From Swiss-Prot:
Amino acids binding NADP(+): G170, G171, N172, G173, L257, T258, N259, P260, R261, V262, S263, S293, P294, V295
Gene this chain is encoded by: lnbE
Gene3D superfamilies, per database record: Aldolase class I
Keywords linked to the UniProt accession: NADP, Oxidoreductase
CDD domains assigned: OYE_like_FMN
SUPFAM superfamilies in alphabetical order: FMN-linked oxidoreductases
Native organism: Aspergillus flavus (strain ATCC 200026 / FGSC A1120 / IAM 13836 / NRRL 3357 / JCM 12722 / SRRC 167)
Name of this chain's protein: NADP-dependent oxidoreductase lnbE
PANTHER family listed in its UniProt record: NADH OXIDOREDUCTASE-RELATED (PTHR22893), NADPH DEHYDROGENASE 2-RELATED (PTHR22893:SF91)
Family, per entry: Belongs to the NADP-dependent oxidoreductase L4BD family.
Signal peptide: none
């Protein structure tokens, strides 16, 4: 019997032909003005070559002030929007779909880079990511509202650029996560101090984007189990259950969760149960989300583990399996998964090589793809 991994899935306005989702992958292939390089069009078009695929494009700054790393794309300038439009047109020409992940770094941005651009290192509170690291400035009420507006405008810009929707990056210790978790958020106003208050920033940002472009075009990524970049609060499960339940009311296109026991940086299973939780999983969060819309789960999947997740762990839920590194080196990954074709190994050293086409748009298609995929760039 065919795995659910290869069955259709409705995501917002997108009718996917399978459930193999491309993860948002930072690649540092944007120029000094945060405009994606021309080679990004080929890169994304290649990975859209199996019709009906959903790509979540790489984390993209909502404004220059929200950044802190060079060579990362943005979505605020006309030049950025125009280049992204070329990319989304190429993806749609393949019969596939593309969402854009919206990003603000907060306290984990590079303080020197921000200073050069005239910006402060900011966060929910004046708490550094680690001892000895730069101390961010706590955001004012006015700045919080400005950022909510920036996210909404970024969502509008993404739709203008042809994206089918946007995904709020609410995890991995970046700005939204810095409000959600009390390892960073020490505020005593209405943006901190309690579970509902810590959920508020993520919810208000998401609500603003929904009001801007519609709920069918908005999704959220959360990483409850992540303990990197100063995250994983002690009462994590109650905090994220509250947040997920609150987001559920907004009727989003999907919820994206990273699996436990997976390293955010390495995207591979960790050895042994972390923090004494041998049975950690996302089942409680998936249950809380209910049948609102699909849940995407990602992190370290093999073909076997992805099928097991959909067919055995969550047979009654609408689940998508998010793949990262295998999609880097296998542009026709859904086809290879379906037909059991061998994978091209990825080159870890080229993942984050700024501006380079090597290890980016030069991975080969399978021989079968040449015959079975009708259109390729």
């Amino acid at each position: 019997m065919m795995s659910k991994l290869f069955t259709p899935l409705q995501v917002g306005f997108c009718q996917l032909k399978h459930r193999v989702i491309m993860a948002p992958l930072t690649r540092f292939r944007a120029d000094d003005n945060n405009v994606p390089l021309p080679i990004a069009k080929e890169y994304y078009s290649q990975r859209a070559s199996v019709p009906g695929t959903l790509i979540i494009a790489e984390a993209t700054y909502i404004s220059l002030a929200a950044g802190g790393y060079p060579n990362v794309p943005g979505i605020w300038s006309p030049e950025q929007i125009a280049r992204w439009k070329e990319i989304t047109d190429a993806v749609h020409a393949q019969g596939s779909y593309i969402f854009l992940q919206l990003w603000a770094l907060g306290r984990v941005g590079d303080a020197d880079t921000l200073k050069q651009d005239g910006f402060d290192l900011i966060s929910s509170s004046a708490v550094p990511v680690d001892a000895g690291e730069p101390v961010p400035r706590a955001m004012t009420e006015e700045e919080i509202k400005q950022y909510i507006a920036l996210y909404a405008q970024a969502a509008r810009n993404a739709v203008m650029a042809g994206f089918d929707g946007v995904e709020l990056h609410g995890g991995n210790g970046y700005l939204v996560d810095q409000f959600t978790q009390d390892t960073c958020n020490r505020r005593t106003d209405s943006w901190g101090g309690s579970i509902p208050n810590r959920s508020r920033f993520a919810v208000e940002v998401t609500r603003a984007m929904v009001q801007a472009i519609g709920s069918e075009r908005v999704a959220v990524k959360l990483t409850p189990w992540n303990d990197q970049q100063g995250m994983k609060m002690k009462d994590m499960e109650q905090q994220f259950l509250h947040l997920i339940t609150s987001l559920k009311e907004l009727k989003l296109a999907y919820l994206h969760l990273t699996n436990p026991r997976v390293s955010v940086d390495e995207d591979v299973p960790l050895q042994g149960p972390p923090d004494g939780h041998p049975l950690e999983d996302n089942a409680g969060f998936v249950k809380a989300w209910g049948e609102t819309s699909p849940v995407f789960l990602g992190g370290g999947y093999t073909p076997q583990s992805a099928k097991h997740t959909l067919d055995v762990d969550y047979p009654l839920n609408e689940i998508g399996a998010v793949f990262g590194r295998l999609f880097i080196s296998n542009p026709d990954l859904p086809l290879r998964l379906r037909d059991g074709l061998p994978f091209t190994p990825y080159d870890r050293d080229s993942f984050y090589t700024p501006l380079s086409p090597i290890g980016y748009s030069d991975y080969p298609f399978s021989d079968q793809a040449v015959d079975l995929i009708p259109v390729r760039v």
